[in-house]
A protein has these predicted regions:
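Signature of N-terminal electron-transfer/Fe-S-associated modules in redox systems
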Residues: 1-240
Length: 240
């Protein structure tokens, strides 16, 4: 599928101070002459900062890595995880439409997005807050149907639950990620049938959901100040 850059482009791009520090740390993983290997994480951080990848962002990353612009464009246009057009200021919603989710009602979730956000995928809502698309398998088949909103998975969705999530996000809330039907992780809907006496170390949330709760806001743009910058391969101390 041919993918093109958006017709409207910003004049420039620059990483925030902390994101630049993070990017330089990633580049330092690779030996001299091999810095181009860092292109995917750097493009991803540029997208996390801005919400999408603009031409200035792609060219900025290419310059940092000593790459021809066309090489950066080849990578950015090849991988569908890179958004080449503006997305909603609050959240970009990705509905999984592959087999398990399709069977369990993904098409009804797409219908909600068309109604509440925009009739077409990748279009931004009238208030500028949301955009959406249907994507291939996101790997949470046991919790189908599901969607990725920002950095997190919202699972076991129904049209009503997705409507509620969009409304809460629109109001400034960040709903707790994970299953939306009350079950823990991907345990059977009817509850455990075996190993009931085994101490699993279960807490209020499973590990990935707990991480989202700890971060607090997993749909906001990444500025680089959210977590410590770690460069253990340099054998240095944790940078605040």
């Amino acid at each position: 599928m041919l993918r093109r850059l958006h017709k409207d482009q910003p004049a420039s791009f620059a990483f925030t101070e902390k994101n630049l520090e993070w990017a330089q740390g990633q580049i330092s993983k690779y030996p001299e002459g091999r810095q181009a290997s860092a292109i995917i994480p750097l493009l991803w951080r540029a997208q996390e900062q801005e919400g999408w990848l603009s031409r200035p962002a792609i060219e900025h990353v290419a310059n940092m890595l000593g790459m021809a612009y066309i090489r950066g464009l080849e990578v950015a246009t090849f991988y569908f995880m890179f958004q080449l057009q503006p997305v909603g200021s609050v959240a970009h919603i990705q509905i999984c439409g592959t087999t398990s989710c399709m069977i369990c009602g993904a098409e009804a979730l797409v219908a909600v997005c068309k109604e509440m956000i925009a009739p077409s995928a990748h279009a931004v809502s009238a208030d500028g807050k949301f955009s959406w698309e249907e994507v291939e398998c996101l790997g949470a088949c046991a919790n189908a149907p599901m969607a990725q909103i920002g950095k997190d998975y919202y699972e076991d969705l129904t049209p009503a639950k997705l409507r509620d999530l969009i409304g809460r996000f629109s109001g400034g809330e960040v709903p707790v990620a994970g299953p939306q039907n009350g079950r823990y992780s991907c345990e059977p809907l009817s509850g455990l049938t075996s190993l009931k006496d085994f101490e699993s170390g279960r807490t209020q949330y499973n590990a990935s959901v707990q991480r989202a709760v700890d971060l607090g806001d997993t749909v906001k743009r990444t500025l680089g100040t959210e977590v410590p910058i770690l460069t253990p391969w340099l054998q240095d101390k944790v940078k605040a």
